[in-house]
Amino acid sequence: MESPPESMAERKRRLVAGELRDAALMLLATKGFDAVTVDDIAAVAGVSRRTFFRYFASKEDVVVRFLADMGASVVTELAARPRAEPPSAALRHAIWVPLAACTDRADHTERARIVVRLILDTPALHARWLDRQSRWRDALAAELAARHRLDPDTDPYPRMAAGMAMLALDTVLRQWQPGADEQRLAELTDQAFAVVAPALDTPGASQP
Protein backbone atom coordinates (compact mmCIF):
# COMPACT_ATOMS: atom_id res chain seq x y z
CA MET A 1 0.00 0.00 0.00
CA GLU A 2 1.38 3.39 -1.00
CA SER A 3 1.84 6.08 1.64
CA PRO A 4 -0.57 9.03 1.40
CA PRO A 5 0.91 12.10 -0.31
CA GLU A 6 2.68 14.58 1.92
CA SER A 7 0.53 17.58 2.83
CA MET A 8 1.72 21.16 2.44
CA ALA A 9 1.95 21.54 6.22
CA GLU A 10 3.93 18.31 6.59
CA ARG A 11 6.31 19.35 3.82
CA LYS A 12 6.85 22.77 5.41
CA ARG A 13 7.49 21.18 8.79
CA ARG A 14 9.98 18.74 7.30
CA LEU A 15 11.81 21.52 5.45
CA VAL A 16 12.03 23.80 8.49
CA ALA A 17 13.25 20.93 10.66
CA GLY A 18 15.88 20.15 8.03
CA GLU A 19 17.03 23.77 7.90
CA LEU A 20 17.34 23.88 11.68
CA ARG A 21 19.23 20.58 11.73
CA ASP A 22 21.65 21.72 9.01
CA ALA A 23 22.23 25.05 10.76
CA ALA A 24 22.87 23.33 14.08
CA LEU A 25 25.27 20.76 12.65
CA MET A 26 27.17 23.43 10.73
CA LEU A 27 27.57 25.59 13.85
CA LEU A 28 28.48 22.65 16.07
CA ALA A 29 31.08 21.51 13.55
CA THR A 30 32.70 24.94 13.29
CA LYS A 31 32.31 26.43 16.79
CA GLY A 32 32.05 23.47 19.13
CA PHE A 33 29.15 22.26 21.23
CA ASP A 34 29.48 24.55 24.26
CA ALA A 35 29.95 27.69 22.14
CA VAL A 36 26.68 27.28 20.22
CA THR A 37 23.36 28.53 21.60
CA VAL A 38 19.79 27.92 20.50
CA ASP A 39 19.65 31.58 19.47
CA ASP A 40 22.68 31.04 17.20
CA ILE A 41 20.99 28.10 15.50
CA ALA A 42 17.71 29.95 15.05
CA ALA A 43 19.49 32.98 13.59
CA VAL A 44 21.41 30.96 11.01
CA ALA A 45 18.23 29.09 10.03
CA GLY A 46 16.35 32.38 9.75
CA VAL A 47 13.66 31.53 12.29
CA SER A 48 12.73 32.66 15.78
CA ARG A 49 13.77 31.03 19.04
CA ARG A 50 10.12 30.06 19.56
CA THR A 51 10.09 28.30 16.18
CA PHE A 52 13.20 26.34 17.13
CA PHE A 53 11.45 24.96 20.20
CA ARG A 54 8.49 23.86 18.12
CA TYR A 55 10.81 21.36 16.45
CA PHE A 56 13.50 20.54 19.00
CA ALA A 57 13.59 20.46 22.80
CA SER A 58 17.24 21.57 22.95
CA LYS A 59 20.42 21.72 20.89
CA GLU A 60 21.20 18.24 22.22
CA ASP A 61 17.92 17.07 20.71
CA VAL A 62 19.11 18.10 17.24
CA VAL A 63 22.05 15.72 17.54
CA VAL A 64 19.86 12.99 19.02
CA ARG A 65 17.59 13.21 15.96
CA PHE A 66 20.68 12.90 13.75
CA LEU A 67 21.58 9.73 15.65
CA ALA A 68 18.02 8.42 15.57
CA ASP A 69 17.94 8.63 11.79
CA MET A 70 21.22 6.72 11.60
CA GLY A 71 19.98 3.95 13.87
CA ALA A 72 16.65 3.59 12.13
CA SER A 73 18.38 3.02 8.81
CA VAL A 74 20.63 0.32 10.31
CA VAL A 75 17.66 -1.76 11.46
CA THR A 76 15.70 -1.14 8.25
CA GLU A 77 18.63 -2.17 6.07
CA LEU A 78 19.23 -5.37 8.03
CA ALA A 79 15.58 -6.35 7.74
CA ALA A 80 15.76 -5.91 3.96
CA ARG A 81 18.76 -8.21 3.47
CA PRO A 82 18.26 -11.76 2.08
CA ARG A 83 17.75 -14.30 4.85
CA ALA A 84 20.36 -16.60 3.30
CA GLU A 85 23.07 -13.93 3.41
CA PRO A 86 25.83 -14.52 6.00
CA PRO A 87 25.15 -12.44 9.14
CA SER A 88 28.48 -10.62 8.87
CA ALA A 89 27.68 -9.48 5.32
CA ALA A 90 24.13 -8.44 6.23
CA LEU A 91 25.26 -6.50 9.29
CA ARG A 92 28.18 -4.95 7.43
CA HIS A 93 25.76 -3.65 4.80
CA ALA A 94 23.33 -2.38 7.44
CA ILE A 95 26.08 -0.48 9.26
CA TRP A 96 27.58 0.84 6.03
CA VAL A 97 24.43 2.54 4.69
CA PRO A 98 24.32 5.37 7.30
CA LEU A 99 28.10 5.73 7.12
CA ALA A 100 27.94 6.14 3.34
CA ALA A 101 25.22 8.76 3.77
CA CYS A 102 27.73 10.85 5.71
CA THR A 103 30.00 11.00 2.66
CA ASP A 104 27.53 11.95 -0.08
CA ARG A 105 29.24 15.34 -0.56
CA ALA A 106 32.77 16.50 0.22
CA ASP A 107 31.57 19.35 2.45
CA HIS A 108 29.07 17.07 4.16
CA THR A 109 31.72 14.43 4.85
CA GLU A 110 33.96 16.68 6.94
CA ARG A 111 31.03 18.28 8.75
CA ALA A 112 29.64 14.86 9.64
CA ARG A 113 33.06 13.71 10.84
CA ILE A 114 33.42 16.72 13.13
CA VAL A 115 29.92 16.26 14.51
CA VAL A 116 30.69 12.59 15.18
CA ARG A 117 33.81 13.66 17.09
CA LEU A 118 31.68 16.08 19.12
CA ILE A 119 29.28 13.26 19.94
CA LEU A 120 32.11 11.01 21.08
CA ASP A 121 34.00 13.71 22.99
CA THR A 122 31.17 15.71 24.63
CA PRO A 123 29.93 13.93 27.79
CA ALA A 124 26.30 15.03 27.43
CA LEU A 125 26.18 13.94 23.80
CA HIS A 126 28.12 10.75 24.40
CA ALA A 127 25.59 9.72 27.04
CA ARG A 128 22.84 10.15 24.44
CA TRP A 129 24.94 8.18 21.95
CA LEU A 130 25.27 5.26 24.36
CA ASP A 131 21.54 5.35 25.06
CA ARG A 132 20.76 5.26 21.34
CA GLN A 133 23.22 2.44 20.78
CA SER A 134 21.47 0.41 23.46
CA ARG A 135 18.14 0.85 21.66
CA TRP A 136 19.64 -0.07 18.28
CA ARG A 137 21.29 -3.12 19.82
CA ASP A 138 17.94 -4.33 21.13
CA ALA A 139 16.27 -3.75 17.75
CA LEU A 140 19.09 -5.49 15.88
CA ALA A 141 18.97 -8.40 18.33
CA ALA A 142 15.24 -8.81 17.74
CA GLU A 143 15.74 -8.80 13.97
CA LEU A 144 18.64 -11.28 14.18
CA ALA A 145 16.60 -13.58 16.41
CA ALA A 146 13.76 -13.54 13.89
CA ARG A 147 16.10 -14.11 10.93
CA HIS A 148 17.76 -17.13 12.53
CA ARG A 149 14.74 -18.42 14.47
CA LEU A 150 16.48 -18.06 17.80
CA ASP A 151 15.04 -17.18 21.20
CA PRO A 152 16.92 -14.08 22.44
CA ASP A 153 15.95 -14.94 26.02
CA THR A 154 17.79 -18.27 25.93
CA ASP A 155 20.31 -17.96 23.09
CA PRO A 156 23.07 -15.36 23.54
CA TYR A 157 23.78 -15.06 19.81
CA PRO A 158 21.30 -12.30 18.84
CA ARG A 159 22.41 -9.87 21.55
CA MET A 160 26.08 -10.74 21.20
CA ALA A 161 25.95 -10.30 17.42
CA ALA A 162 24.07 -7.01 17.71
CA GLY A 163 26.62 -5.82 20.26
CA MET A 164 29.51 -6.72 17.95
CA ALA A 165 27.88 -4.81 15.10
CA MET A 166 27.51 -1.73 17.31
CA LEU A 167 31.12 -2.09 18.45
CA ALA A 168 32.22 -2.23 14.81
CA LEU A 169 30.29 0.98 14.09
CA ASP A 170 31.78 2.71 17.12
CA THR A 171 35.29 1.62 16.11
CA VAL A 172 34.90 2.96 12.57
CA LEU A 173 33.63 6.30 13.86
CA ARG A 174 36.53 6.61 16.30
CA GLN A 175 39.06 5.84 13.54
CA TRP A 176 37.49 8.34 11.13
CA GLN A 177 40.34 10.81 10.50
CA PRO A 178 40.32 14.21 8.75
CA GLY A 179 40.37 13.87 4.98
CA ALA A 180 39.03 10.31 4.96
CA ASP A 181 36.72 9.79 1.99
CA GLU A 182 34.05 7.18 1.32
CA GLN A 183 36.65 4.65 0.17
CA ARG A 184 38.61 5.01 3.41
CA LEU A 185 35.45 4.64 5.50
CA ALA A 186 34.59 1.50 3.53
CA GLU A 187 38.06 0.11 4.25
CA LEU A 188 37.66 0.82 7.98
CA THR A 189 34.26 -0.87 7.93
CA ASP A 190 35.70 -3.93 6.17
CA GLN A 191 38.54 -4.13 8.69
CA ALA A 192 36.18 -3.92 11.66
CA PHE A 193 33.88 -6.62 10.33
CA ALA A 194 36.79 -8.87 9.38
CA VAL A 195 37.59 -9.04 13.10
CA VAL A 196 34.08 -10.05 14.20
CA ALA A 197 32.92 -12.02 11.12
CA PRO A 198 33.97 -15.48 12.43
CA ALA A 199 31.76 -15.05 15.50
CA LEU A 200 28.92 -13.38 13.60
CA ASP A 201 28.71 -16.20 11.08
CA THR A 202 28.03 -18.94 13.64
CA PRO A 203 24.40 -18.37 14.71
CA GLY A 204 23.11 -21.24 16.79
CA ALA A 205 26.61 -22.44 17.69
CA SER A 206 25.85 -21.70 21.33
CA GLN A 207 23.03 -24.24 21.32
CA PRO A 208 23.91 -27.60 22.98
Whereabouts are the PLM-identified features?
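Amphipathic C-terminal alpha-helical segment
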Residues: 128-132, 158, 162-182, 198-204
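Append "Primarily bacterial transcriptional regulators
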Residues: 40-43, 52, 91
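Basic, helix-initiating cap at the start of DNA-binding domains
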Residues: 1-31, 35-47
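Amphipathic alpha-helical segments enriched in hydrophobic/aromatic and basic residues
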Residues: 28, 37-38, 59-70, 91, ...
